C-alpha cells in the first residue's frame, strides 16, 4: 500500500509545478479585516476537532497518515488548476470531496487548511489574511455537503454517490465564496442579494463544467483508493461498498 501511495504522491508533486500565479479563491488582503477575523473564528472549531480525529484514528493504523497525504496531494493538484473569474478570485476544482468521503468533514478541514497554506506560501495563491475565509468555503462547507450527499446515496449506487458528492461539494464551495464576497462588498443597488447574484453567476460559467470534471476524476481516484488502501478504509469505517 505504501509503495502505491508513494508513487501517486510523487507524480502529484510533479504536476503541481506550474507557472500560473492566479489568486486561489479570495486573494490576500481582498477582504476587510473584520470579515477575515470572523471567518478565522468560525473555522477554528472544525480545525480543532479535525486534529483530534486524526490523532485518534492514527492510533489504530499509522498508514492512515499516508492515505491522508494522498488525498491532500489530490486536493493540491486540482485546486492548482485555475481559470480567472471574478475580480479578486478565480475558478478551479477543489479536490476536497474525496477527503470528505473517506475521512469525513472535520478531517477535510485540515486537508483544506494544509493545501491553502502551502499554496499561499509556495505559489502565492490566496493568502494568509484570507485563510479563514478560504478554509471555510473549500475545507469546511464544501466537504460537509460532499459528506452528506455521499452518505445519502452510497447504498443506492456508490459511483453515482461519489460523483454527486464531489460535483455538488465543489459547487457549494463557490456558493459560499460568493456569499463571502457579497457580504464584504454589497452592491450599491440591490445590496447583498444583488452582489451575490453577480458573483455566483460569473463563477457558474466556468465552475459547472469544472465541477463535473472533478466528479468524474474523483470516481476514478476513489476506485484506486478502494483497491490499494482497503485496510485503512476499514479502520476509518466511513466508506462501505
Curated annotation (Swiss-Prot):
Gene3D superfamilies for the chain: 1.10.1760.20
InterPro entries named among the record's database cross-references: CbiM, CbiM/NikMN
Keyword Cell membrane: yes
Keyword set, alphabetical order: Cell membrane, Cobalamin biosynthesis, Cobalt, Cobalt transport, Ion transport, Membrane, Signal, Transmembrane, Transmembrane helix, Transport
Compartmental location: Cell membrane
GO molecular function: cobalt ion transmembrane transporter activity
Membrane topology designation: Multi-pass membrane protein
Residue spans crossing the bilayer: 29-49, 66-86, 98-118, 121-141, 160-180, 202-222
Signal peptide (from-to): 1-23
Pfam families: CbiM
This protein's GO CC annotations: ATP-binding cassette (ABC) transporter complex
One record GO biological process: cobalamin biosynthetic process
Keyword Transport: yes
Pathway: Cofactor biosynthesis; adenosylcobalamin biosynthesis
NCBIfam families per the UniProt record, alphabetical: cbiM, PRK08319.1
Subunit structure: Forms an energy-coupling factor (ECF) transporter complex composed of an ATP-binding protein (A component, CbiO), a transmembrane protein (T component, CbiQ) and 2 possible substrate-capture proteins (S components, CbiM and CbiN) of unknown stoichimetry.
Family: Belongs to the CbiM family.
UniProt function note: Part of the energy-coupling factor (ECF) transporter complex CbiMNOQ involved in cobalt import.
Name of the protein this chain belongs to: Cobalt transport protein CbiM
Organism of derivation: Clostridium tetani (strain Massachusetts / E88)
Origin organism lineage: Bacteria, Bacillati, Bacillota, Clostridia, Eubacteriales
